[in-house]
Structures are given as structure tokens and as C-alpha cells.
């Protein structure tokens, strides 16, 4: 098989896609010593992170740099949280930093990464195992501290979005040695209630030690095996816990978790009104269209109606009758003229008319017309027809 030849840009783009889609590299923590630290005029931070044998170039964009709790310096031993990607123009990979904390929690970081890898390999983070968050939840179970800022944020957001959604608060410790047990009990409690639609597990931001209860392995299994969909709203946007990975939906803050879990009644009412208007317009347009079709059918029926055909035939018959009558009258008149001419001609040649002018018709006893005197003999009888009658005479003498 012939090997495909790649352009430099194609190769860099391919490597970038591979790295960007790697589960570990797209959400990682690394530790080392800061060097070449520089804050750019744009607000972005550029530096290197090194250990005894290696170093990697790092960048922290201004949006993340604003959230730093301290300004790092060259020589600081720190833990970076972020992702690895490739700057395509140079073909160089670098670490895109989202948070910086001073080293001292190295053991916790190692334990976090080990547990994350274990649960990932067991399939607890797989997307196809995650349950869908109900769009119109009526009752939501909230597991958090009853006195913290998180519960206040969740209640305020819920009231603003939909006062009809009921929140059931399960009071739990959210940090400390006994916190995981409380959180697990809360998950199990709401999991077994038929009236609960969604569960929110939440707390405000804090250090890795303060959020460590949400990295508990037993809590991860409890969330994974929960009968209800779970929304994790732990810490701030840059904080990630095992709870975030295993939950059905991760929210960057407790307020955002409430935004996801509680549907906005005003938006729903607006959507319903829009759907009503769309449905009304659709029905109205359909009715108008059907009326047009009906009118077209009525016109077609009128055009093709048998009554129209019959009426047209009556008109045609009347026209034919008038033509026939006209032809008959013309024929009669023509025949009258011919008859008159024939009568005139007949009258002109009628022997009786000739007799009126003094002529007569002479026939012998056998009724033969006598036209010459040679046919007349003495002492015979002849018939003479005159204008007003006929007479029989005897011939006494014939003049030769």
C-alpha cells in the first residue's frame, strides 16, 4: 500500500486532534517549578514548567489569570490544572493552564489521578451510561450544606426560573472526614424516592482539600448506581472532581446546576404561545387553502355541470331549428317562385286560353284532332271545342 504524503499543516492538525481528544491530556494536572514567568500586556501569562529532566511551555489566558489566588514567581513549585494541545503554526505542543496552586497537595493529586483512571477504565465516565436530565422536573432533591452559599444560590435561581418546582434539601456535610458518608446517604435517599425527578449535588468553590469529599470512590459508585439523574454543581468553573466526571451532567457552579435542573417557566410559556401562534397560522392557512381548493372545485363543477351542457344543447337546438325554419321558408319561397313561373308558362301554352282568342279544336268521331281539311269527309260528324263549350256538327259539304 502506498504511503500517503501529508503537508506540514495536515500533520500538525492531525497531531492536534489526537492530543485534543485524548481523555487524560484534555483534563490534566502537572507539577513542577516555574521559570521564564511573564505577564503579557494582553493579560495572558507565559511561562515554563520544569523538573530535573524536562520542561514544557505553558500559557494561561487572561480569562483564567483573573481568577488566580496568588501571583506565581520563578522558582515556585506549583500544580497546574488544564490541558495539553498543539499550537499548529509552530507545531509545538504546550500546556494550556486553567488554574495554578502551590505544591503541597501532591499526594491528593496523585490519589485523584489514580482514582480517575481506575473509574474511567471501569466505564463509570462513559457517555452512554449517563441518564438524560428531565426537561420538566417537578421535584428536585438537593444535597448540600443547609447553611452554605450554594443552597442559597440554588434556591434563588429556582424561584427566579420556576416557583412551581419543589426543592427538597438534604442537609449534608460538604467537607471533612464525615462528608462522603453524608453525601452518599443523600444520594441513596433520593434514589429510592419515586417522586424525585432529578438530584443536584453541590457546594461552593474551595481548595482541593476542601473539595476532597467529592473525590470519594464510594460516592462515585453511589452516583453511578443512582436511579435518578444526577447534576454535579461543585466548586467553580475551573474546579473538577470525580463527582463531576461520574454524574450525568456537570455544571460549573451550583447556580448553573439549578439552571440545568429547573426549567424556565417564562420560556416555556413563551414557547407555548409561539407554538399556539404557529398552530393558529397553520390552521388558518390550511383553511384558506382548502377554501381556495373548494372554490376551484365549485368553478370546475359549474364549468363541467350537466345543466350547462343541457343549456348549451338547447341553444344549439334552437339555432338548428331557426336555421331549419329559415331554410324551409327559403325553400318554400323558392318553390313558389318556380311554381309561379311554371304556371305562367303553362297558362301561356294552355289550349283553352288560345280558344279565348277565337280559335277552336276540331276532333273526329274517334276523338282524333283534325288539323287539315283532307281529314274531313261529307256526311260525317265532327266535334268542335270552343271557349265556352263544345258542339257536334254534321258536315254537309267540304270545299276542296
Swiss-Prot record:
Entry GO MF terms: exodeoxyribonuclease VII activity; nucleic acid binding
CDD domains: ExoVII_LU_OBF (cd04489)
Entry similarity comment: Belongs to the XseA family.
Native source organism of the sequence: Clostridium novyi (strain NT)
The gene coding this protein: xseA
Swiss-Prot/TrEMBL catalytic activity: Exonucleolytic cleavage in either 5'- to 3'- or 3'- to 5'-direction to yield nucleoside 5'-phosphates
Function: Bidirectionally degrades single-stranded DNA into large acid-insoluble oligonucleotides, which are then degraded further into small acid-soluble oligonucleotides.
GO BP: any one term: DNA catabolic process
Protein name per UniProt: Exodeoxyribonuclease 7 large subunit
Protein location: Cytoplasm
Keyword tags: Cytoplasm, Exonuclease, Hydrolase, Nuclease
Stretches assigned to coiled coil: none
Primary enzyme class: hydrolase
